[in-house]
UniProtKB/Swiss-Prot annotation:
Keywords: GTP-binding, Nucleotide-binding
Residues where GTP binds: 28-35, 76-80, 133-136
GO cellular component, one term: endomembrane system
Gene name of the record: RABL2A
Gene Ontology terms, MF aspect: GTP binding; GTPase activity
Described function: Plays an essential role in male fertility, sperm intra-flagellar transport, and tail assembly. Binds, in a GTP-regulated manner, to a specific set of effector proteins including key proteins involved in cilia development and function and delivers them into the growing sperm tail.
Family: Belongs to the small GTPase superfamily. Rab family.
Source superkingdom: Eukaryota
Record protein name field: Rab-like protein 2A
Quaternary structure note: Interacts with IFT27, IFT81, IFT172, ATP6V1E1, HK1, LDHC, MAPRE1 and HSPA2.
């Protein structure tokens, strides 16, 4: 018997069961451990989806924040970062960013400025966490990293190898993303919402008069567009 192609997967079904959803992106140079951090956090429960068309890996996760079920999409660069720039669609409607550098490779720390500049070009207001990965020597946590201080960004010392601070990092990132989405003042969000509203208005204008008159006779509830 042929498989029913229309049946939603468990991951897709999560969209309907969740109270809300957020998108969290990861930035940083190649081989700083972004994917390893996500896999360490999600462990056996993760189901990565390779989206080669967009040169990214998508990880889906369900979290509970303040009693609500949140569907989280973690976006990983999947090698696209080797070009030192990401496609604009990568940033589209992101609610938080995790920016990673390898504490043992100074060049990855210096490149944070480039990644941060690009992030703010597309997402001026979303919360961003700076992550120092691969802390084999605990003494490195005593070092001062001016980049995070300069931009008033939280700095986490983590290890994908042994799991140090990984769970806290991602749980905090999820909470920041949810809080941002609920209280967003991002100008780009307003622009996207205006464009979506404009498209809806255009569609209504294109409806034939007969259909419009029949729709007027049928009462319907006004549904507010969710804030993204």
């Amino acid at each position: 018997m042929a498989e029913d192609k229309t049946k939603p997967s468990e991951l897709d079904q999560g969209k309907y069961d969740a109270d809300d959803n957020v998108k969290i992106i990861c930035l940083g140079d190649s081989a700083v451990g972004k994917s390893k951090l996500m896999e360490r956090f999600l462990m056996d429960g993760f189901q990565p989806q390779q989206l080669s068309t967009y040169a990214l890996t998508l990880y889906k996760h369900t979290a509970t924040v303040d009693g609500k079920t949140i569907l989280v999409d973690f976006w990983d660069t999947a090698g696209q970062e080797r070009f030192q720039s990401m496609h604009a669609s990568y940033y589209h409607k992101a609610h938080a960013c995790i920016m990673v550098f390898d504490i043992q490779r100074k060049v990855t720390y210096r490149n944070l400025s480039t990644w941060y500049t690009e992030l703010r070009e597309f997402r001026p207001e979303i919360p961003c966490i700076v992550v120092a990965n691969k802390i084999d020597d605990i003494n490195v946590t005593q070092k001062s990293f001016n980049f995070a201080k300069k931009f008033s960004l939280p700095l986490y010392f983590v290890s994908a190898a042994d799991g140090t601070n990984v769970v806290k990092l991602f749980n905090d990132a999820i909470r920041l993303a949810v809080s941002y989405k609920q209280n967003s003042q991002d100008f780009m969000d307003e622009i996207f919402q205006e464009l979506e509203n404009f498209s809806l208005e255009q569609e209504e204008e294109d409806v034939p008069d007969q259909e419009q008159s029949s729709s007027i006779e049928t009462p319907s509830e006004e549904v507010a567009s969710p804030h993204s």
